[in-house]
Each structure stands twice: as C-alpha cells, then as structure tokens.
Amino acid sequence: MRIILLGAPGAGKGTQAQFIMEKYGIPQISTGDMLRAAVKSGSELGKQAKDIMDAGKLVTDELVIALVKERIAQEDCRNGFLLDGFPRTIPQADAMKEAGINVDYVLEFDVPDELIVDRIVGRRVHAPSGRVYHVKFNPPKVEGKDDVTGEELTTRKDDQEETVRKRLVEYHQMTAPLIGYYSKEAEAGNTKYAKVDGTKPVAEVRAALEKILG
C-alpha cells in the first residue's frame, strides 16, 4: 500500500500517519529524514546532497527522487510506504511518475485555514518534557503552567500566528495544485483519491481512513 498524504501544516496528518503506519505496517518516508540518513551514510547520493546543502542551496528534485527510489527499494517498504511532505509541487509529482513510483492512495486532509490557525496558535508546550497543551482544546489545569511540574509553558516560534499564516500561503501556492493533479490521475485510473474531513475528532478521522484503505 503506497500512500501520499496531502494537507496544510496543522491539518492533522502527523497524528493519522502514526495510525496508518501501525495499522498497515508501512514506514513513513519523510524527505528530511531521508536526506539526513543519506548524508550520514556517506553514499554517492548522500555526498551529492551534502555538497548542495553545504553550499546553502536547495536539493534538486532529481536528487530527491533518486533518494526516494533508493529508500522504497529497502526491505521495510516491501508492503508499501507513506509519503508525507513529498511531492510538494506538480513538477515533483511528474518526476515521481516518470521514475515509475506509483501510488495506490492519495489522501487529502481538508481543514479550513482559520481552524488551522486556531489549532496551531493555541498550542503551548512544556519544553523540558515535550508535553503539549492547547488553550482551547486541551488546556492545562492552571493557565500557562505545566500540569506535572507547575513550570511555565511557552509558545514555539513555529506556532506564532504570522509564521502559520505564511506557511499556509506557501502551501496554497505550491502544494494545493497537487489536489487537482491527483484528482485527474484518479479519474484516469492511475490512483485512488480521497478527501478526508480533518475538522472531525481524531477517532472519526481514523474510522474514515479505515473505510477508505480497507
């Protein structure tokens, strides 16, 4: 089962990716992890990636596709894989197709921007333990304090409203066109495309995914 997850940052992909990995026994492939592993391994592709990153440039689509091909040929991907954060653009999706990387399901997590802003901006973290709260959906017992230690909670830089809105603009410009791309691919019988209502509670989203994936 080869799956691509689409959706804006904060749409709940991470939570459900965990569930899909456990239920279907497939690994999640993130391009960031893949690049780090390739550089660490010192492979030919890793060396190329390191040179590009050391020069402060963006790794080319060709190189990322080559890394994806190498990664999915590994034993743990025998039953499939879950791609999150890639492809991000139509040229990347085209390059994947040309490289013969076929996908069984493309799942779009649909959540309105304002709800995403609400979800992310309301997050508060206790940095030492990694505990995460939300002012509206999962508040601490005492406002601004960690339940266990009573220490101050903080807001991550990435969770500030300005940053979140900027990331959403980027998503709509770069990645949202993939929704049309994969809808057409599904019409042509090349993949299955499903839109998931990401505003629903976690358990309901999970049940919807089970129904789609079987």
From Swiss-Prot:
Coiled-coil portions: none
| Catalysis: reaction(s) | AMP + ATP = 2 ADP
Extract the ranges annotated as region (NMP).
30-59
* Keyword Transmembrane in record: no
Span of the signal peptide: none
| Positions carrying N6-acetyllysine | 192
Domain of life, per lineage: Bacteria
Q: Where is this region: LID?
A: 122-159
Q: Name one GO biological process term.
A: AMP salvage
Residues that bind ATP, according to the entry?
10-15, 123, 132-133, 200
Which residues make up the binding site for AMP? 31, 36, 57-59, 85-88, 92, 156, 167
- Look at the named UniProt entry and state the broad enzyme category this protein falls under: transferase
Under CDD domains, the record lists: ADK
The pathway that the record names for this protein is: Purine metabolism; AMP biosynthesis via salvage pathway; AMP from ADP: step 1/1
- Functional note: Catalyzes the reversible transfer of the terminal phosphate group between ATP and AMP. Plays an important role in cellular energy homeostasis and in adenine nucleotide metabolism.
What PANTHER family is this protein classified in? Answer: NUCLEOTIDE KINASE
What is the official name of this protein in its record?
Adenylate kinase
The organism encoding this protein is Escherichia coli O127:H6 (strain E2348/69 / EPEC)
